[in-house]
């Protein structure tokens, strides 16, 4: 992947940053692509760094992801809840599966989506092979994960658990407006221009 470089003029001359490092200076973290352990470690490190730098300022987490590994996503979510800084979440493009959990786990009142964003909620996906007992263990783990994720959705959206169970039975795509009505986000951002 080609990462753009930004040149910044300072009193000491020019300084080149990769775009993600420059955004980090403004307390912006980009979560894009599949959520896995490597991505989670990077996002967690950035959250911890920004919180240690100044825990009175918000951190903006921009999300464009098809989802990914549940344990990796939950590690990011736990860190978002652990740090003192408020974490504002913004869906750009797609916030699917585990990414939708991260979107709705932002600080209440600071969960946003851009107008053409799509949010996908569904039950956890998984597969197993091997001996029957191993398959049963994996199936039980998926059921535990589903219960945990539904509880998170219940707590962050205010929707009844039985509605969430029904709504996540199959892929459930929501527009930004539908995600707002559901309680996954608080507002739809149209533009940042000041009047």
From Swiss-Prot:
Top-level EC class: hydrolase
Q: Could you name the active-site residues?
A: 97, 122
Tell me which EC number(s) this protein carries. 3.4.21.92
A GO cellular component entry from the record: endopeptidase Clp complex
Gene3D superfamilies for the chain: 2-enoyl-CoA Hydratase, Chain A, domain 1
User: Where, per UniProt, does this protein localize?
Assistant: Cytoplasm
Q: Which UniProt keywords apply?
A: Cytoplasm, Hydrolase, Protease, Serine protease
Main location (coarse class)? cytoplasm
Recorded GO MF terms: ATP-dependent peptidase activity; ATPase binding; serine-type endopeptidase activity
The record, for SUPFAM superfamilies, names: ClpP/crotonase (SSF52096)
Q: Does the keyword Hydrolase apply?
A: yes
Q: Which PROSITE patterns match?
A: CLP_PROTEASE_HIS, CLP_PROTEASE_SER
The coiled-coil regions, if any, are none
Please verify whether the record's keywords include Ubl conjugation. no
Which biological process annotations from GO are given for this protein? protein quality control for misfolded or incompletely synthesized proteins
Q: Which reaction does it catalyse?
A: Hydrolysis of proteins to small peptides in the presence of ATP and magnesium. alpha-casein is the usual test substrate. In the absence of ATP, only oligopeptides shorter than five residues are hydrolyzed (such as succinyl-Leu-Tyr-|-NHMec, and Leu-Tyr-Leu-|-Tyr-Trp, in which cleavage of the -Tyr-|-Leu- and -Tyr-|-Trp bonds also occurs)
State how it assembles.
Fourteen ClpP subunits assemble into 2 heptameric rings which stack back to back to give a disk-like structure with a central cavity, resembling the structure of eukaryotic proteasomes.
What is its biological role? Cleaves peptides in various proteins in a process that requires ATP hydrolysis. Has a chymotrypsin-like activity. Plays a major role in the degradation of misfolded proteins.
Q: Which family does it belong to?
A: Belongs to the peptidase S14 family.
- Write down the PANTHER family for this protein, in alphabetical order: ATP-DEPENDENT CLP PROTEASE PROTEOLYTIC SUBUNIT
Task: Write down what this protein is called.
Answer: ATP-dependent Clp protease proteolytic subunit
